[in-house]
Curated annotation (Swiss-Prot):
Organism: Salmonella typhimurium (strain SL1344)
Cofactor dependency: Mg(2+)
Region span, Disordered: 690-711
Name of the protein described by the UniProt record: Polyribonucleotide nucleotidyltransferase
Mutant lacking the gene: phenotype: Increased stability of speF mRNA.
């Protein structure tokens, strides 16, 4: 009854298996993909009919990790998986971006892709496996899809490209690049790098695209054997007469509107033209559909903008193809934050802050691939007012998570190592205005805010978004694209880096036929733009400030013996808790005996260091200490001698005469001088009041308050 069809192939150092026909037979298509022991089950369901009035393509991609895949039970209260994590959201976007452009224009049937990680090898990331699975399932489904696509991860180790490196290899790699594309063209690139050259990055893209051809071939072979018949779907016939009528009413007016340089004014004028045109046409013929008219008007808009660019005319806002919008760069704009900057590029603006915290503030991520700690946090917020709209405000959406991750990639390469700068750093970018490339504005603002905070970043970084308009062999690469140019163009190509190289590259291509030469032109043009922006940024601040903010915690580091760690922590954390409250500092102890004391007040930090040194000091036999009685028992008294240490004064060592009752001589809390007689192998301390008194004050009674004793 169950007749699975299986295809295996070698992919770099891994063996990939594609299997269909075994599970989820009621889905439109389902594939189990495994790479070594990492397995992802991917299903696709497509609706045969579109919803009435549907005017956009409702594609949903869900990626979900099951903890059983790693042999674990979820740690949440309900012991089951909850809403998608940030990592799951990012991988869902990674799957979505290369497949979305391959559905035909006009196809608006609902399609859902669900990728479930069911087994994981900690050395093999499931993201590439899930992308291959989505490509295979869509290709098998019969849904109109111009795939398949392949996907590959490329590393760069010892000046060599590595296909699908393991997690251990990635730690040694200067590059982590994911590339996806069809047999003929690259569609998507997502990467972070340690300031590599444009040629090295382009080489990685080409290498990954070449290597993934084996994936595409394997999927094609599977489709030949197990694929479903392609749906009999045809786009709606073009109504040439209606198109001509709409163009006659609106084309020249839209062309004039797209010469208005102010975004809000332009949008208002375009909306007026559209509504008046639709209103007039429906008045003439009530059978016309407003959605269809809207699509025709959108096509006219697109043609107006694109034809103007291809003809070499000025862009929407009057710029030439390689011009950058006006820049305004300010630092230290918020008085009490640790670091802040306001970066404005045309009608795109980011208010960026940097906050310093201790290692305790780092984020602990309990991921399927294992637990890790992240000491550099980057959060991107895109409120509705940034584009002059109203809307919901709440938890971050997929787009905000994706843009924040891209901006973080852009800055990560220049962040200092924790051993040199032992702070957790959080950067927050508030997009206050947006008209294209707000994620790259966040990179620029983050670099400025980090410098303002005194974070010793290795170099300043800046980001730029490039666009493309291509018709046949004629193409134009645009620098610093507007939102409209992104929406109406063929490519969104974001590059971040320093003067020395690229730290992040993200590319989304909406058409096939983007050649290596076009990517080379875009990278070189982006480099010129990046260097221009860095030049302007350096006029505002050209190096990290010499000291961190007075409002930031200063971290002081001392070293103690590892066998003294338990003394500083105390039973159940009692000593370190009391120290923290007493000194007003934050104290962290590492396994190697490194102690980090964080305080905004230098005197408090010095006091905390002194107290820790007291606690960890070795008890000297024969030395006299000032002590305080902490417990009284029948056979003597326990006396604390500082540093969390306590010793026993036997009843015979209280006075130079026979003592019948300890409480006749000592009271709780009384201060007394004590001499250390012995520290045994178990660390127990034997003390004497009698000898301390005889040595320092022979005639004094032991009840008298002890005075400070010299060594």
């Amino acid at each position: 009854m169950l007749n699975p069809i299986v295809r295996k192939f070698q992919y770099g150092q891994h063996t990939v298996t594609l299997e269909t026909g075994m599970m989820a037979r009621q889905a439109t298509a389902a594939v189990m993909v495994s790479m070594d022991d990492t397995a992802v089950f991917v299903t696709v369901v497509g609706q045969k009919k579109a919803k009435p009035g549907q005017d956009f393509f409702p594609l949903t991609v869900n990626y979900q990790e099951r903890t059983y895949a790693a042999g674990r039970i979820p740690g949440s209260f309900f012991r089951r998986e909850g809403r998608p994590s940030e990592g799951e959201t990012l991988i869902a976007r990674l799957i979505d971006r290369p497949v979305r452009p391959l559905f035909p224009e006009g196809f608006v049937n609902e399609v859902q892709v669900i990728a479930t990680v069911v087994s994981v090898n900690p050395q093999v990331n499931p993201d590439i496996v899930a992308m291959i699975g989505a490509s295979a399932a869509l290709s098998l489904s019969g849904i109109p899809f111009n795939g398949p696509i392949g996907a590959a991860r490329v590393g760069y180790i010892n000046d060599q490209y590595v296909l699908n490196p393991t997690q251990d290899e990635l730690k040694e790699s200067k590059l982590d690049l994911v590339v996806a594309g069809t047999e003929a063209a690259v569609l998507m690139v997502e990467s972070e790098a340690e300031l590599l050259s444009e040629d090295t990055m382009l080489g990685a893209v080409v290498f990954g695209h070449e290597q993934q051809q084996v994936v595409i071939q394997a999927i094609n072979d599977l489709v030949k054997e197990a694929g479903k018949p392609r749906w009999d779907w045809q786009p709606e016939a073009v109504n040439d007469a209606l198109n001509a009528r709409v163009a006659a009413l609106a084309e020249s007016r839209l062309s004039d509107a797209y010469r208005i340089t102010d975004k809000q004014e332009r949008y208002a004028q375009v909306d007026v033209i559209k509504s008046e045109t639709i209103e007039q046409l429906i008045a003439e013929d009530e059978t016309l559909d407003a959605n269809e008219l809207g699509e025709i008007l959108h096509a006219i808009e697109k043609n107006v903008v694109r034809s103007r660019v291809l003809a070499g005319e000025p862009r929407i806002d009057g710029r030439e193809k390689d011009m950058i919008r006006g820049l305004d760069v300010r630092t230290g704009v918020l008085p009490r934050t640790h670091g802040s900057a306001l970066f404005t590029r045309g009608e795109t603006q980011a208010l960026v802050t940097a906050t310093l915290g201790t290692a305790r503030d780092a984020q602990v991520l309990d991921e399927l691939m294992g637990e890790r700690t992240d000491s550099f946090l980057f959060h991107y917020n895109f409120p509705p007012y940034s584009v002059g709209e109203t809307g919901m405000v709440g938890s971050p959406k997929r787009r905000e998570i994706g843009h924040g991750r891209l901006a973080k990639r852009g800055v990560l390469a220049v962040m200092p190592d924790m051993d040199k700068f032992p702070y957790t750093v959080r950067v927050v970018s508030e997009i206050t205005e947006s008209n294209g490339s707000s994620s790259m504005a966040s990179v620029c603002g983050a670099s400025l805010a980090l410098m303002d905070a005194g974070v010793p970043i290795k170099a300043a970084v800046a980001g730029i978004a490039m666009g493309l308009v291509k018709e046949g062999d004629n193409y134009v690469v645009l620098s610093d694209i507007l939102g409209d140019e992104d929406h109406l163009g063929d490519m969104d190509f974001k590059v971040a880096g320093s003067r020395d190289g690229i730290s992040a590259l993200q590319m989304d291509i909406k058409i096939e036929g983007i050649t290596k030469e076009i990517m080379q032109v875009a990278l070189n043009q982006a480099k010129g733009a990046r260097l221009h922006i860095l030049g302007v940024m350096e006029q505002a601040i050209n190096a990290p400030r010499g000291d961190i903010s007075e409002f930031a915690p200063r971290i002081h580091t001392i070293k103690i013996s590892t066998d003294k760690i338990k003394d500083v922590i105390g039973k159940g954390g009692s000593v370190i808790r009391a120290l923290t409250e007493e000194t007003g500092t934050t104290i962290e102890i590492e396994d190697d005996g490194t102690v980090k004391i964080a305080a905004t007040d230098g005197e408090k930090a010095k006091y905390a260091i002194r107290r820790i040194e007291e606690i960890t000091a070795e008890i000297e036999v024969g030395r006299i200490y000032n002590g305080k009685v902490t417990r009284i028992v029948d056979f003597g008294a326990f006396v604390a001698i500082g540093g969390g240490k306590e010793g026993l004064v036997h009843i015979s060592q209280i006075a130079d005469k026979r003592v019948e009752k300890v409480t006749d001589y000592l009271q709780m809390g009384q201060e007394v001088p004590v001499k250390v007689l012995e520290v045994d192998r178990q660390g127990r301390v034997r003390l004497s009041i009698k000898e301390a008194t005889e040595q320092s004050q022979p005639a004094a009674a032991p009840e008298a308050p002890a005075s400070e004793q010299a060594e």
